[in-house]
Amino acid sequence: MTHPIVKSFYDTATGSWQYVFHDPETREGAIVDPVLDYDPNAGATATRRADEILAYVAGEGLTIKWILDTHPHADHFSAGPYLKEQLGAPTAIGEKVVEVQKLWKGIYNLDDGFRIDGGQWGRLFADGETFMIGGIEVAVLFTPGHTLASIAYVAGDAAFVHDTLMMPDSGTSRADFPGGDAAILHASIERILALPDDTRVFVGHDYAPDGREPLCESTVRQQRESNIHIRDGFARSDYVALRDARDATLPLPDLMLAALQINIRGGRLPEPEANGQRYLKIPLNQFEGDFSE
């Protein structure tokens, strides 16, 4: 088996990990969960993080075959369309994204011009589908629970699991977003932990607890033995109770209401209005606020 070379890129503003993996023999590669910079105070976007990826791709002489999303993110904007424009590679996500689009179309009260067929991406992957990056087979695993549409990409010995597992000292991702479900997330995590012990696990977020450096990589064995939420022997009912209690204490992500209306469009910004300006739309009082001191 050819093992992919994996390069990680950390976005400090959102605690998000982005990845480029490639076949060292053919130099073909893919990008996973790229971030578009966004300053909420100024309402401004930038491509600094994506440009770092482009510089790496050019420096390594890679041919990017796919720009991959694991799900529509609630904490950052996707840079997929920008990278597609620069590289010519198609974008892809899991086929259940249509369920997320239907859900959030109602929350944002979007008009019928908003497509809910996933057509904003070049490809919608089904569970169990495979594709090739050079000589490396990439398998798609449906891993819902954090969202309705979450998938993981298993490329050789590397699994890109995004918002399911976190680093072992941080546990697992939340399951309280619209369409989330802790019991379903637990089942998805079990599916990931059924991969071979030495499978490299690359997470989507790390918030550097206790002041350590941000980390992105562990193994299935390490997750099974030491993850604080799901180590061996932790029953699903116990996990659901723990996850639900933990989620009840968490504020919504700072960028959720801004990011999701971009990301259900495949990362495309809203169309300009008559004055040539683009606008975000925020539903007031749709969610419970945090007014604690």
Q: Which sequence ranges carry the predicted segments?
A:
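Accessory terminal helices/loops
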Residues: 2-4, 187-200, 204-293
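Conserved beta-strand hairpin/beta-sheet module of binuclear metal-dependent hydrolase folds
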Residues: 2-63, 152-162
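Core dinuclear metal-dependent hydrolase active-site scaffold
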Residues: 6-9, 20, 127-155
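Active-site environment of divalent metal-dependent phosphoester hydrolases
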Residues: 14, 38-39, 72-77, 98-101, ...
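Divalent metal-coordination and catalytic microenvironments
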Residues: 21, 33, 71, 83, ...
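Active-site neighborhood of phospho(di)ester-bond hydrolases with catalytic His/Asp-centered motifs
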Residues: 32, 63-72, 92-95, 143-145, ...
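Active-site HxH/HxHxD metal-binding segment of metal-dependent hydrolases
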Residues: 36-136, 226
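Active-site-adjacent loop/tail segments of enzyme domains
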Residues: 172-195
